[in-house]
């Protein structure tokens, strides 16, 4: 009879040999594998992994690896703290300050995912969990749609825009953003990794279906751009087929989804687009009034009315953030913080691009990071996805992974567990 340890022996064999490093790596792996299932569990495992890794650093003095983004990251954290300190209500910025701890994911990924095989196992676990979340979300869509057909048969589209599927995440934007990043990585895996089993195409179909049913246009845009990039990396000559496939897909889609796509060209008649235009105008006025440190993290909703034109009543909706990463950071934390964030994002992309050009095996990991970066950045023009912990955690993990395959191929794995340089197959 197969024991629990035998079942997970391939995973255990990838952990470091040093005691506290082994514990830290196992706990961090559990954190990564709960990103899509439970935010509370993922952050609890992350905290325990960071504690175990700190003990490992103190006892064993290992070499520490980190992506080359220290300067922009330090400046981003500094300006966030300064903006919070100088805000009209500093207490409202506590959440943004605490969220800076999530950047430890960059450190822990680079040092506790010890080999290309370890990374492959984590990614495959994430792909399966994404499919599970997709199945749950598809069931949620069926329940919601059936209810709306019974209660509001003439306004199904309208109510679907306000009652979307959240998967395990409690909110559709968190679910959609996570699925988008996993989708980009899974497409990279299928197109660019060697010897991939057909089973993973079924997984992709489930994930893609959940993204379509998520009904979120920014997520659709991010996925579309990621696919364009990855097909360009895989078979550039096939790019001309995309417009044809898009047209066929649009014509074959149910009327609800056709209407969702058409609404992009009708911003004044779509409440979610109309409120974004109002928010972006308000954000611009905030930046002009407070260019250096902004109005303060968590303070936008409190001062929102002050930046509307005289006598204008705000559109009813969610006003805690501005549905745009660039405007959000500029208005909330000031232009210096925004500049440091743009530097940080550019450094993450440039680092992945350089690794992409150096590595020969497991190149799909670097391409997944670049595709995920494009999807995340473009979706962030219509949603404040950098400010949502569930999506940010997945993004930081994705952007840390190219360093692992670079170290694996150059033989720079942890001394207590040399990283494998073999290609990752599936």
Model-derived segments and spans:
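Membrane-interface helix caps and helix-loop-helix hairpins in membrane proteins
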Residues: 85-94, 212-213, 381-386
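Alpha-helical transmembrane segments of multi-pass inner-membrane proteins
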Residues: 27-32, 46-49, 77, 81-82, ...
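Long extracytoplasmic/lumenal interhelical loops at the membrane interface
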Residues: 267-281, 293-333
């Amino acid at each position: 009879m197969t024991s629990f340890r035998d079942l997970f022996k391939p995973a255990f064999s990838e952990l470091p040999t040093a005691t506290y490093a082994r514990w830290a790596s196992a706990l961090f792996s559990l954190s990564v594998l709960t990103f899509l299932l439970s935010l509370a569990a993922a952050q609890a495992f992350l905290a325990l992994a960071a504690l175990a890794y700190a003990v490992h650093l103190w006892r064993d003095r290992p070499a520490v690896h980190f992506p080359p983004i220290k300067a922009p990251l330090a400046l981003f954290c500094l300006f966030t703290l300064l903006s919070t300190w100088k805000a009209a209500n500093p207490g409202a910025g506590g959440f943004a300050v605490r969220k800076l701890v999530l950047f430890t994911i960059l450190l822990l990924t680079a040092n506790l995912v010890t080999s290309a095989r370890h990374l492959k196992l984590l990614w495959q676990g994430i792909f399966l969990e994404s499919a599970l979340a997709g199945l749950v979300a598809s069931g949620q869509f069926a329940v919601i749609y059936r209810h709306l057909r019974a209660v509001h048969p003439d306004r199904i589209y309208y109510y679907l825009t306000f009652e979307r599927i959240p998967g395990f995440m409690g909110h559709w934007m968190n679910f959609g953003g996570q699925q988008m990043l996993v989708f980009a990585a899974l497409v990279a895996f299928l197109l660019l990794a060697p010897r991939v089993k057909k089973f993973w195409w079924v997984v992709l179909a489930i994930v893609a279906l959940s993204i379509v049913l998520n009904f979120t246009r920014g997520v659709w845009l991010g996925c579309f751009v990621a696919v364009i990039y990855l097909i360009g990396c895989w078979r550039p000559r096939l790019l001309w087929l995309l417009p044809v496939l898009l047209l066929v897909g649009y014509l074959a889609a149910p009327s609800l989804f056709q209407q969702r796509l058409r609404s992009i060209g009708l911003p004044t008649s779509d409440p979610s687009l109309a409120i974004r235009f109002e928010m972006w105008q308000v954000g611009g006025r905030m930046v002009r009034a407070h260019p250096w440190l902004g109005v303060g993290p968590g303070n936008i909703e409190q001062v929102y009315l002050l930046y509307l034109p005289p006598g204008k009543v705000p559109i009813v909706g969610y006003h805690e953030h501005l549905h745009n990463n660039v405007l959000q950071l500029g208005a909330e934390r000031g232009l210096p913080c925004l500049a440091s964030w743009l530097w940080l994002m550019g450094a993450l992309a440039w680092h992945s691009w350089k690794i992409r050009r150096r590595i020969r095996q497991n190149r799909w990991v670097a391409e997944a990071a670049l595709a995920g970066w494009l999807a995340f950045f473009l979706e962030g023009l219509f949603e404040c996805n950098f400010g949502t912990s569930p999506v940010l955690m997945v993004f930081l993990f994705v952007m840390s992974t190219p360093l692992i395959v670079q170290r694996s191929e150059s033989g720079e794995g942890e001394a207590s567990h040399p990283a494998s340089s073999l290609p990752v197959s599936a």
